[in-house]
């Protein structure tokens, strides 16, 4: 499906600053979601600022506060888009920490989030952490499997690349 997102503000912000804020916000929100792995050529995020409030964003502190608020709005809207997706029954957030670089961590997160096998296990309430580790393995990032820990809903599924002591039934119910 095509995603159309329109955000308006009455703050007075220059076009250049607004563009930077939008790019930063999109990078950490809309560009991090996936439902079916497809992207429409018409997906759009449009932010308009008319300055009608008379509040001008000129200081670095004001611009930073605006950027943070805009990023928060974008993240919440991105979450809603996922939750409203066609045939969506689960909402899962993938967090990768300890990657060698931010790009490698993002590659690993995207591989897990887009994996049909991982999605199938989530949909079937099957805590198959092996599918997660498999997706991380093929993502192209350099990985030390002995350092991989996987939690499912806050419960340890894998520690140091091997199965943790958490009972499978507990993971299924998580």
Please give the residue ranges for each predicted region:
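A structural signal for small-residue-enriched, beta-sheet-centric alpha/beta enzyme cores
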Residues: 1-174
């Amino acid at each position: 499906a095509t995603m159309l997102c329109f955000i308006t503000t009455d703050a007075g912000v220059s076009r250049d600053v607004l563009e930077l804020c939008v790019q930063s916000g999109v990078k950490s929100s809309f560009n991090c979601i996936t439902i079916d792995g497809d992207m429409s050529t018409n997906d759009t995020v449009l932010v308009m600022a008319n300055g009608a409030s008379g509040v001008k964003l000129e200081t670095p502190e004001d611009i930073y506060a605006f950027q943070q608020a805009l990023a928060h709005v974008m993240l919440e809207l991105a979450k809603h888009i996922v939750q409203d997706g066609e045939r969506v029954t689960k909402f899962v957030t993938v967090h990768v920490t300890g990657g060698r670089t931010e790009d490698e961590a993002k590659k690993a997160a995207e591989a897990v989030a887009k994996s049909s096998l991982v999605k199938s296990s989530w949909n079937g309430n099957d805590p198959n952490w092996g599918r997660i580790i498999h997706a991380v393995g093929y993502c192209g990032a350099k990985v030390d499997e002995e350092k991989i820990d996987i939690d499912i809903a806050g419960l340890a599924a894998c520690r140091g690349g091997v199965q943790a002591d958490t009972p499978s039934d507990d993971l299924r119910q998580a």
